[in-house]
């Protein structure tokens, strides 16, 4: 738990040193999808520690790219919008917007709640083990989200 908190604090300190341009991606995506930009930041922190060049390779055909860790299972769907794995990796704002798109789908399907945030990572399967993963992920993102909000609170 201490390691998690240390990681959160370290990345939060780093996160607030980003240029205005980087923050604009979260702010714009949040505005356009009606999602708190800080929630998007919390998801990005949980997914990649805010690393826009993150790659999580499970196998040649199963991998996730970028700050929001967009999974390869979504690439066929995204291709109809002209979004490619390369654009998700090289265009930070495209990656953040795509993450916001999938989070918005979860909110539309299940409402704005932490289990919906968990669906971003663990999907919508009704199997008990998937529900447990959703709840765990939602709780982790909630913790990060609250840390972000506490950092912004007036002192």
Which residues does each PLM region occupy?
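Short hotspots in intrinsically disordered terminal tails
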Residues: 1-2, 152
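Sec-dependent signal peptide recognition
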Residues: 2-12
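Proteins with a high burden of low-complexity, intrinsically disordered sequence enriched in S/T/G/P/A and R
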Residues: 3-4, 21-23
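N-terminal leader/targeting segments
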Residues: 12-13, 22
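Exposed boundary/loop context
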Residues: 13-15, 59
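N-terminal signal peptide c-region/cleavage motif recognized by signal peptidases
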Residues: 17-19
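Catalytic glycan-binding domains that act on GlcNAc-containing polysaccharides
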Residues: 23-155
């Amino acid at each position: 738990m201490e390691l998690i908190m240390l990681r959160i604090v370290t990345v939060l300190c780093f996160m607030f040193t980003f240029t205005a341009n980087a923050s604009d991606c979260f702010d714009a995506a949040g505005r356009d999808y009606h999602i708190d930009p800080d929630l998007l930041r919390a998801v990005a922190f949980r997914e990649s520690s805010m690393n826009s060049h993150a790659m999580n390779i499970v196998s040649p055909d199963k991998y996730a790219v970028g700050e929001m860790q967009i999974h390869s299972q979504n690439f066929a769907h995204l291709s109809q919008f002209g979004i490619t794995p390369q654009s998700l990796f090289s265009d930070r704002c495209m990656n953040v917007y795509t993450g916001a798109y999938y989070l918005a789908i979860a909110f539309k399907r299940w409402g704005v709640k932490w289990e919906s945030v968990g669906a971003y990572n663990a999907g919508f399967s009704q199997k008990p083990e998937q529900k447990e993963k959703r709840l765990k992920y939602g709780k982790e993102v909630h913790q990060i989200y609250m840390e972000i909000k506490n950092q912004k609170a007036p002192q």
